[in-house]
Amino acid sequence: MFISLWEFFYGHFFRFWMKWLLRQMTGKCELQRIFDTYVGAQRTHRIENSLTYSKNKVLQKATHVVQSEVDKYVDDIMKEKNINPEKDASFKICMKMCLLQITGYKQLYLDVESVRKRPYDSDNLQHEELLMKLWNLLMPTKKLNARISKQWAEIGFQGDDPKTDFRGMGILGLINLVYFSENYTSEAHQILSRSNHPKLGYSYAIVGINLTEMAYSLLKSEALKFHLYNLVPGIPTMEHFHQFYCYLVYEFDKFWFEEEPESIMYFNLYREKFHEKIKGLLLDCNVALTLKV
């Protein structure tokens, strides 16, 4: 109750008068003061909040524009705030970068969601070729005897036909598995080997798909904003999402063996523990989680 009242008072009265007072003292609007004071994710995050909670409709809409409209909205913001480009030459550059990051994050989520919603289709030649590519990357010296085969268990699928394991994450789960195996082949082989440990083993592919869900949920909840705002000085892409997934796969394997669970039956418990660890790291405004091998 008290917190709600404070948020109402702050949003409707205190914030307005504080902004007005600071403008009179510094001769600069809130956006300019943010650019003068902060860098990296802190800067973009504060700009995003300032635009979102502004009473000015032009500023509010600026966080929802498409990439092709960014330049126009930067100019509109400068007009609304009476910012002279000759006196503040850096404002336009900084605002454009922030808007590209802010709107780019929203677009990245839509792109990832679109791929996630696409189910694995065994009648789709591209899907089938991608699945075969995964096998060949992980098992280069061993031939797959048949498309429907118990051999799939060797790389961590549950049944004879892997397509059933992609139901939750769609084709996104397979794309991530292939991306890691193709771009970090030696690490993928090492982790696959470790996943066959007699006591601490786990299903490599199933865990990989599970970590796709983790990466997706963190993106959806906006927990990846600090990470991506620090990492990408512009528009984040699917490549950056795949790279974050690779970080999760590599770090989860280390975490699992450090924790030494009694059995795979405790997977959900340790998965959630790892999830909380990652969420904690992502709260740091200076965070940039990259796979270092």
Curated annotation (Swiss-Prot):
GO molecular function, one term: GTPase activator activity
Xref: PROSITE patterns: ELMO (PS51335)
Protein's UniProt keywords contain rRNA-binding: no
Any GO BP: defense response to virus
Tissue: Alveolar cells (morphologically type II cells) and alveolar macrophages (at protein level). Expressed in brain, colon, heart, kidney, liver, lung, muscle, placenta, small intestine, spleen, stomach and testis. In lung it is expressed in alveolar macrophages and alveolar walls.
One Gene Ontology cellular component: membrane
The keyword Zinc appears for this protein: no
Boundaries of every ELMO domain copy: 126-282
Family matches, as InterPro entries: ELMO_dom, ELMO_domain-containing
Record's signal peptide: none
Keywords, sorted A to Z: Antiviral defense, GTPase activation
Known function: Acts as a GTPase-activating protein (GAP) toward guanine nucleotide exchange factors like ARL2, ARL3, ARF1 and ARF6, but not for GTPases outside the Arf family. Regulates IFN-related antiviral responses.
PANTHER family listed in its UniProt record: ELMO DOMAIN-CONTAINING PROTEIN 2, ENGULFMENT AND CELL MOTILITY
Protein name, UniProt field: ELMO domain-containing protein 2
Species, as recorded: Homo sapiens
Upper taxonomic lineage: Eukaryota, Metazoa, Chordata, Craniata, Vertebrata
Designated gene of the protein: ELMOD2
